[in-house]
Structures are given as C-alpha cells and as structure tokens.
Amino acid sequence: MLARLVNRPNSTTAGEYIDRILRARVYDVAMESPLERASRLSRRVGNEILLKREDLQPTFSFKLRGAYNKIASLSNHAAARGVICASAGNHAQGVALAASRRQIPAVIVMPVTTPRIKVQAVADLGGEVVLHGDDYDSAYERALVIARERQMVFVHPFDDPDVIAGQ
C-alpha cells in the first residue's frame, strides 16, 4: 500500500496543512481527549509518560477526527454522491459515523478476515459493509472500483490533506 504513494508535484505544503488544521471541524463530533499520567510506567522508565485518551472518543479512536474533517469539507454536491473507504476497523467506524452525522451514504469495504465486532460496529453506525478479499490491499482495490462505478468520494485513511489535518 505505501509503495503506491508517490510524491505529487502539487502536494500540500506545511503552511497549507497548518491552515487546514486550524480550520478543521473535528470537535463537531470528537471530544478534546485528556492526557492521563501513566504513574507506574513513568516510574519504570524514569520519565513522565502521558497517555492521550483517544479511547474516549465515540469510536474509541483518533481516526474519527480525520474521517469527519474530510467528510465535513465536502461540497453538498460531492457529499450527495456518498463516501466510500477501505478499512478493517477504526477508519471504517470513523467514516460511517461521520457520514451518518452528515446524513449521506457510506460504503465501507472490509477484508473478509475483519473481526465480526468491527463489522457490526460499522453496520450499527449506518455504514453499508462490503466484505472483500483477505487483506487490506484487496479491500482497497475493490473500494476504488466501487467508488468509480457509483461515483462516490473515496476517503483515504491517511493520504489525504483533509484527513491529515483532522487527525
């Protein structure tokens, strides 16, 4: 998957990312998660260790912020076509929840090996689950095909400026 990523000539600059981060609407759906001191671990390593409690988010992960920021940034025309992603877990739940908040369709392509609890969580959030392939790469390829066929917006889990700014 990472091998497919290439440096694009018009990639986003650091300044553009800062601007996107400042405009991110992530707290429409996510909470500002607290830092919690890990006392025993801090003593063990001889330094202060703080845990960022992203497990307190509605989907138990920071991935919600990136997915929500991307989906919130879509024009009404693009959003009306619906969104699609490939994921075996946290990004899938983030996309499903963000799409449900925006009241748009979401298709989530997951490997057939995805734990049932993750598949059910996506379905409970309103995502249309498509099980395909034994691994992420197979699900990813299928999601791209469906995106083209249905003219849906593909929400990449990390290679998207709006997702990055949200996370």
Show the residue positions of the predicted features:
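PLP-dependent amino-acid enzyme catalytic core
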Residues: 1-167
